Regions:
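Helix-start (N-cap) detector for alpha-helical repeat units in TPR-like alpha-solenoids
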Residues: 65, 108-109, 142-143, 176-177, ...
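Structural signature of tandem alpha-helical TPR/SEL1-like repeats
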Residues: 84-95, 120-133, 155-167, 189-214, ...
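Structural marker of alpha-solenoid helical repeat scaffolds
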Residues: 103, 137, 171, 218, ...
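Terminal, low-structured helical/coil segments at or just beyond the last alpha-helical repeat
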Residues: 376-380, 385-448
Length: 448
């Protein structure tokens, strides 16, 4: 029997967090925040920003204030277009907006842009701190609420992200980033259900399409919105191949806006995988990595595809980089283990599987791969019985995990095969001892 594909290699990573645009830049229960503290609930939104602005006295912004702010925005925009963000430029941008905020405390937009500057380089602790300062002053500041939602999403707090995005939309229904964020969460729920005929799946799709249409109604050039829209239509393609045609049209619309958008290239890769065009998929995944070397999902996908091509050295490098960027990525440890196994580094492979097991003992992939490692690769004439017994133990542990029934049936067959092989080995007669070598015949004496 062959090893089930879900355990022989990690799953394709369908880009999520990297799709979400920052709201402050034109659209984009308690858990642990980016700083390790509990996440407080978002403030209650009683009035939208627009309604509050109508009810409050008109804010007068001086010419000097506007000039200082516009100058900082121009620098930010120039860096954005040049893809020039690094720790230094992010901090410089934050300092410029902070100087404007200090000089003009009433200009809350300047303080919010301090957070956006930090967020451009993934300085999430600093960005979160700034956004929280903003909503203390203005609880219905939609852009800051939206960006806090993104931070919590990126740090694995989907429920908190949804709360903040919902609040952001209540504060400002035209926030493209919050709309895309909510649609992304709905897309993830669709994937978990995996049944287009399910009523909940249909409702999630309807809501996701509404949010994405709303986002595009505000910003018709949003490559992020078109990309997520395309991913939504990729779901359910197994029962309706026409959905792939619609998905491709939406991805092409995103490409017209920004073909160098890394999540778009990753989405193209997923599309080509569904079309069984593996070489084109790999090309798209590689393009995504080139555009954004820190793009974890794209690196995972390159690693997954190259495992299939048995390019184990490339897969090893990709999964190693993912672990560097995301040390708690379970699938990356599994992928690295498979790559090292292909490179004949069995000790290294076992170490990676065990790291995955320690990371999440409830998942079964590590146990299954350890079983395969001992059964197919570590067994030899010298330690045959011990290796098979160890493999059987891992298969039995796998059977206690949550997994598809088909994979559990495969594990049961492997256990039965091990038992039969060991039993036959034990019944076999011991090998006949080799006969002692006969003495060489005497040689006649040499003639003088």
């Amino acid at each position: 029997m062959t090893t089930p594909s879900m355990f022989s290699r990690p799953r394709l990573a369908a880009c999520t967090a990297a799709l979400i645009a920052l709201a402050a830049c034109g659209g984009g229960g308690a858990g642990t925040s980016a700083r390790g503290s509990t996440v407080p609930p978002p403030p209650k939104i009683t009035r939208s920003e627009a309604a509050a602005a109508r009810a409050e006295p008109r804010r007068e912004v001086s010419k000097d204030t506007r000039s200082d702010f516009d100058s900082a925005v121009q620098q930010f925009t120039a860096t954005d277009k040049a893809h020039g963000w690094n720790d230094s430029t992010c901090r410089q941008s934050a300092d410029r907006f902070q100087a404007v905020a200090r000089a003009h405390p009433d200009l809350i937009e300047a303080q919010a842009m301090v957070g956006v500057s930090y967020q451009r380089c993934g300085m999430l602790d600093d960005a979160e701190r700034v956004y929280r300062q903003v909503i203390q002053v203005k609880p219905n500041h939609g852009a800051s609420l939206s960006n806090l939602g993104e931070i919590y999403f990126r740090t694995g707090r989907a429920s908190e992200a949804r709360q903040y995005w919902d609040s952001a939309i209540k504060a400002n229904g035209k926030l493209v980033g919050a709309r895309i964020g909510v649609a992304t969460l709905e897309l993830e729920q669709m994937r978990k259900i995996g049944n287009p005929k399910d009523a909940t799946w249909k409702k999630l799709e309807e809501d996701a399409r509404f949010n994405l249409s709303s986002a595009l109604g505000v910003d018709s050039d949003s490559a992020a919105a078109y990309t997520v829209y395309g991913l939504v239509y990729m779901e359910g393609w197994q029962t309706n191949k026409n959905r792939l045609d619609l998905a491709k049209l939406l991805l092409d619309e995103a490409s017209k806006r920004n073909e160098k958008y890394a999540p778009l290239q990753n989405a193209y890769g997923l599309y080509y995988m569904r079309r069984a065009s593996i070489n084109q998929a790999l090309q798209a995944f590689n393009a995504a990595v080139e555009l954004d070397p820190r793009f974890v999902e794209a690196r995972m996908n390159v690693g997954q595809v190259t495992l299939g091509f048995r390019k184990y050295d490339t897969a090893r490098d990709m999964f190693s980089k993912v672990i560097e960027l995301s040390p708690k990525n379970y699938d990356a440890y599994i992928g690295l283990g498979i790559a090292l196994r292909g490179l004949k580094d069995l000790d290294g492979a076992e170490a990676q599987y065990k790291k995955a097991k320690d990371l999440d003992p409830r998942r079964g992939e590590a146990y299954y791969n350890l079983a395969i490692l001992y059964k197919e690769f570590r067994s030899s004439k010298e330690d045959f019985i011990a290796s098979y017994k160890q493999a059987k133990e891992y298969f039995q542990q796998f059977l206690t995990m949550q997994a598809d029934q088909a994979d559990k049936n495969e594990a049961k067959e492997q256990i039965a095969m091990i038992d039969k092989t060991v039993q036959n080995f034990m019944k076999a007669p011991p090998p006949t001892p080799a006969a002692a070598p006969q003495a060489a015949p005497a040689q006649p004496p040499a003639k003088p």
